[in-house]
Amino acid sequence: MVVLLFVVHPASTGTAVDTVSSLHIVALIPARFASSRLPGKPLADIDGRPMIEHVYRRVSASPIVSQVIVATDDLRIATRVHEFGGHVRLTKAHETGTDRLAEVAATLDCDLVVNVQGDEPLIDPGAIAEAVAPFAADPSVMVTTLFRRITQPAELTNPNVVKVVVDRGGFALYFSRSPIPHLRDPRGGWPPLYKHVGLYAYRRSALMVLASLEPTPLERAESLEQLRALEHGIRIKAVETKYDSFGVDTPEDLEQVRRLLAAPAGSA
């Protein structure tokens, strides 16, 4: 049996905002150099800065985050983070980003850990506030993430766009690279279809428990770390968001982000 421990932090005035502001929140950005489709992508130049710096700066703009740390096992990435004045921790080599985060979180004194992917240079700081809000509303929430409605048909069949189905209480039922749910009878019309926005927040204790658990068959089959939590019975609160995610997975993705950030409205 997995037992998750948590601490209830009373709000100073009883509001969700006050409760969140009373929590010590650390944002961790896992970054690795190796990538089958785009090696070295954290250091890829985007508008004169490495991608990891764009992510770091945007996360640092969140007023609820006390500290931002890049977690990497690569000295080249660590050196570049030091050069732009960021905080970085060198870790052991890990199979997953969750395990990398847990190594760093074990050394931290904080309430919540926010996991921001190192290949999301367009991350909006407002998304962090949305992911953290459920912890103030419900002390039983251990892990949160975000999702939004699919608007482009191509996203449904793209395996790099992870789909999610959510129960009536707002908890994730399943994540998949395949289209879910399956529409057996087209005459009934499609229900709302949602994609996962890959930002997570954890109570520190929950992250440590999750990292201690064995990888699971579905996690390996889909190559989705969040399925480890679901298979072990850890519920993930899913929050619908207006913010989108744009992970850089391919050279084509990188060129698109470069165009967006080179435009005046997209300047970082």
Residue ranges: model-predicted function:
Residues 1-19:
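N-terminal amphipathic/basic-hydrophobic helices that include classical n-h-c signal peptides
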